[in-house]
Amino acid sequence: MDRPGTFTRAELIELSGLSAPTIGEVAGHLIRKGVVKDLGTGPSSGGRRPSLMEFNARHAYTAVMDIGPTRTRLAVADLRGETIQHEIVDTPKGVGPQEGLSHLADDLLALLERTRIPRGRLLAVAAGAPGIVGVKEGTLVLAPNLTGWRDVPMRDILAATLRTTVVVENDVNLALLGEHWRGAARGHESCAFVFVGTGIGAAVLIDGVLLHGHHDMAGEIAVMCMGPEFVDRDFGGRGCLETLAGLDALKARWPDGVPRDPERWIPSLLEAARSGDAQAQRAVEETARMIGIATANIGAVVDPSVVVLGGAMFAQAEPLADAVRDVVRRLQRNPFDVVLSQLGKEAPVAGGLLVAVAEARRQLTHQLELSVARSAHP
């Protein structure tokens, strides 16, 4: 029913295999609930004029909360994932996770109020977090870039304020889902996302299924060992790859050239490298080499058709992506494309809306099944 365009009762009878009286009763129930719009009768093709109906994508709403170390993106959307309102707020500082999450939940409720959406019509919220997420438990197990956020019952804290279903997921996983839905990985059922910022992480989709792993740590490539010489080295909580190839490592390789504007320093580095700055060139080559090796390793294990590069490292950074591609080409045996993110910072938001819409549809489907059961067995 939620396909674009109209449908008729006759089509519902044919597709569902249910009787005309059952479909009539269920359709009437859905129209009364506002899930479906009654558009009256359509043109006749020779017989009775058909009753036209349309799924009401604004019968209820979904939302997403993409929590970052400094900024949090909020969005409200309809049941097809079409964004209605979007806002960026500061991630609370100097408070514990309970207070911080409650504050962000209040920000989302304020956004709903400004959009004139009643709280009771919010069916599902997806919350993305930068760290290890226990998906089944709805817990943020560890978030190195959020001080003090460890073993946080995110789902329960947010649900207590929002009073709706909350789904919690790792932000890089959401980014991959977003790119697969509306970005650079569209049409690729086996793909991966490599995120490089202050932290490093990856997400993997195989045959359309997002991988979480036994400990919900699939894609935690920050700890990938980049060579035998690093086996006995202590990298603390950051991990080998993150220490060698994260933004802090790149800044350390080009310390004198980092401008004050954080949005400009990657383009400044690449421009310096193009202009012949030897230190900038080495910084790009060494960093791209590490990321390229890690990307090739992912390709060898996962066999994707495409790997998407995202995060602050790759914003406005096609030359850096080219350097990564050069390394991957020398190492890969199973060819795959390496592309830049199309959605950028909005990728986790898009993925979160996809997750929230899926949960909302699950709820609506359950309600529909109950309605059908009541109609079949009054």
How would you describe each model-predicted region?
Residues 65, 79, 121-240, 357-378:
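Phosphate-binding/catalytic loop of phosphoryl-transfer enzymes
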Residues 1-41, 45-121, 161, 228-232, ...:
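ATP-binding/phosphotransfer module of carbohydrate and carboxylate kinases, centering on a glycine-rich
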